[in-house]
């Protein structure tokens, strides 16, 4: 099931695909209108692709997508589909990763097998991942993106950046650049 929250102001809209992180994690986006999409079933947004597309079609002034892990997958997918700038932390780019047992269920419920592999994704993509995490490096290397390495081996590079006091600067720099 898809849950949507929003904080609308005037001006550009950031679409944030949430994979379990609370909205306050994205505090550095508060100067923008924000739409938060939550994949409450942890299925890489696969059950809701058509609903998300209809919803995004109705939002003017979309400028960027943002997400972490499976939210990063969705940020890349919908950023590509809508020609938006993307900031993704440790995203999956193929729905074939044995680290998450739910990924098999995501493939089973999806109506869009063409999105199981995002190697076709192009655009203005910025991806962060921990440099000592070979699986995340493999995912990131499959797409066209500006790559940033984070010290560490964890999967969640955004949490690592937050613990280092750097996440706010990363998000601010991304959201305030063209």
Model-inferred region functions:
Residues 2-59:
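Active-site catalytic motif of lipid deacylating hydrolases and related acyltransferases
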Residues 30-31, 82, 143:
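Short, structured coil segments at secondary-structure junctions
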Residues 102-178:
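The feature captures the conserved acid-bearing segment of alpha/beta-hydrolase catalytic domains
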């Amino acid at each position: 099931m898809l849950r949507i929250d929003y904080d609308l102001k005037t001006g550009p809209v950031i679409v944030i695909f949430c994979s379990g992180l609370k909205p306050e994690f994205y505090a550095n986006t508060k100067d923008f209108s924000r739409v938060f999409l939550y994949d409450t079933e942890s299925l890489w947004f696969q059950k809701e692709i058509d609903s998300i597309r209809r919803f995004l079609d109705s939002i003017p002034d979309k400028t960027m997508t943002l997400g972490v892990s499976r939210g990063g997958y969705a940020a890349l997918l919908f950023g590509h589909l809508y020609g938006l700038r993307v900031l993704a932390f440790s995203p999956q780019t193929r729905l074939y990763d044995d680290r998450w047992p739910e990924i098999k269920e995501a493939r089973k419920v999806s109506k869009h097998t063409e999105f199981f592999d995002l190697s076709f994704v192009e655009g203005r993509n910025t991806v962060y991942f921990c440099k000592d995490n070979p699986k995340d490096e493999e995912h990131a290397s499959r797409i066209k993106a500006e790559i940033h390495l984070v010290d560490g081996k964890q999967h969640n590079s955004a949490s690592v950046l937050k613990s280092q006091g750097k996440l706010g600067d990363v998000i601010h720099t991304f959201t305030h650049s063209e």
